[in-house]
Amino acid sequence: MSKKYVIALDQGTTSSRAIVFDHDANMVASSQREFGQIYPQPGWVEHDAMEIWASQSSTLIEALARADIHSEDVAAIGITNQRETTVIWDKMTGKPVYNAIVWQCRRSKAICDELKAQGLEEYVKDCTGLLLDPYFSGTKIKWILDNVEGVRERAEKGELLFGTIDTWLVWKLTEGKVHVTDPTNASRTLLFNIHQQAWDEKLLNALGIPRSLLPEVKPSSAIYGQTRIAGEGSSIAIAGIAGDQQSALFGQLCIDEGMAKNTYGTGCFLLMNTGTEAVKSQQGLLTTIAVGAKGEVNYALEGSVFMGGATIQWLRDELGLIRDAQDTEYFASKVENTNGVYLVPAFVGLGAPYWDPDARGALVGLTRGANRNHIIRAALEAIAYQSRDLLDAMSKDSGVELKQIKVDGGAVANDFLMQFQADITNVDVLRPELTETTAMGAAFLAGLAVGFWSSTAELKHKAGIERRFKPKINDAQRATLYDGWKEAVARTR
């Protein structure tokens, strides 16, 4: 095999990464660059789309150099990305008309309220599997069309293009030749009928979004186009796309009905593959699109928590309680419990299963005896409590009581958090040998599309488990802790 590697581009909320994998799914080299976060007003979050592209393209060049390989050694590139984040650009100049509006941004709440007043809430849920929340792309697009001078007119003339970050990166990588997305990203726009797998005219009309803005939707594992790295060398196929959470689900090989994973990133995201059936949630979860064993469309239930690792960043950057995220395990382990302290990190509202954009964060149960260690421990426990909220909702919706859950993302290196997650949910928590499963999913999708790997069966032995965390507390202890959490959440609403 002359082409011995695949590359995953992992474009996240705070950084862009490129990771080189070999045929045994080993990580050969990687590169990472952070980029700026823009906060124009409270509750507003933006990125500079050109800075995202610059950071992502430079990591691609750097990862190749670190692996000491050339473009002719690479079979394919796969892309995984922060979902929902919205870019609109001029298709002639390639220049964005406004900063990218990030998934965390709440500015389009009034637009959501208007759509609710029009009686569209149930239609949106039935058609897209989503809720009318500022989280999703559709209302962000409308905000740009309505609030940036001249943009609506240009959009109606067909001069502009919309994309989530995957679409933006493919467009840049192919020098403006390919305007495409995949079903997992399309399913997060609030504009995509997940049953018919097509853009929905009724929702486009309701939001006043011209059809010409939207990309073509192609399978998650397919050849979309070719790119030359820095305009040089052999062309490489761009052959896999999946939104970050669906990519992690695929990277964990949760490709059969009833398999689930929890990703601990900026937010926390619990997904369960429900196979070919789209399960409508009664518990405030989302119905979304996942990727099946052969790259086909499957469905999943998803619970999203906005503040996971971002809570730890807050401890570091705003409170100065820690120097590094890794310090949290040391400080949390210095105390036996939180001394009754609960942190509810509703900094931008609450996600699933509450969906309360007006909730605000709270530190509850403080006494004179509360110290730094208790607060740090409460922050870690909050991540696990929020995941328990999601797990309970998912069990009720699916009728499946999970016995184990696969985990990935940066925070899974924290043994304290993983053990507390097992304790509070009463399920086994399985940590993989390779925790970069989001990037791995994109690499798998791209490699399968070009025949680098023959099937998902070939991949199964490449996804080993490093450690299994088993619950260590009893039911009474678990109930007392979780009741305290529910009381704390009630105080934020």
Curated annotation (Swiss-Prot):
Gene Ontology cellular-component annotations: cytosol
**Activity control summary:** Inhibited by fructose 1,6-bisphosphate (FBP).
Against PROSITE patterns, the record matches this protein to: FGGY_KINASES_1, FGGY_KINASES_2
Quote one Gene Ontology molecular function term.
glycerol kinase activity
Pathway listed: Polyol metabolism; glycerol degradation via glycerol kinase pathway; sn-glycerol 3-phosphate from glycerol: step 1/1
Q: Does the keyword Transport apply?
A: no
Catalytic activity annotation: glycerol + ATP = sn-glycerol 3-phosphate + ADP + H(+)
Q: Which domain of life is it from?
A: Bacteria
The top EC class, named as a word, is transferase
Does the entry feature the keyword ATP-binding, yes or no? yes
EC numbers listed for it are 2.7.1.30
Q: Where, in this chain's numbering, is ATP bound?
A: T13, T14, S15, T266, G309, Q313, G410
Q: Give residues annotated as binding glycerol.
A: R83, E84, Y135, D244, Q245
Q: Could you tell me the keywords of this UniProt record? A: ATP-binding, Glycerol metabolism, Kinase, Nucleotide-binding, Transferase
Residues bound to sn-glycerol 3-phosphate are T13, R83, E84, Y135, D244
User: What does the entry give for GO biological process?
Assistant: glycerol catabolic process; glycerol metabolic process; glycerol-3-phosphate metabolic process
Record-listed ADP binding positions: T13, R17, T266, G309, G410, N414
Q: Which InterPro entries match?
A: ATPase_NBD (IPR043129), Carb_kinase_FGGY (IPR000577), Carb_kinase_FGGY_CS (IPR018483), FGGY_C (IPR018485), FGGY_N (IPR018484), Glycerol_kin (IPR005999)
Gene3D superfamilies in alphabetical order: 3.30.420.40
For this chain, the family text in UniProt reads: Belongs to the FGGY kinase family.
Record's function text: Key enzyme in the regulation of glycerol uptake and metabolism. Catalyzes the phosphorylation of glycerol to yield sn-glycerol 3-phosphate.
Instruction: State what protein this is by name.
Output: Glycerol kinase
Q: Which organism is it from?
A: Shewanella piezotolerans (strain WP3 / JCM 13877)
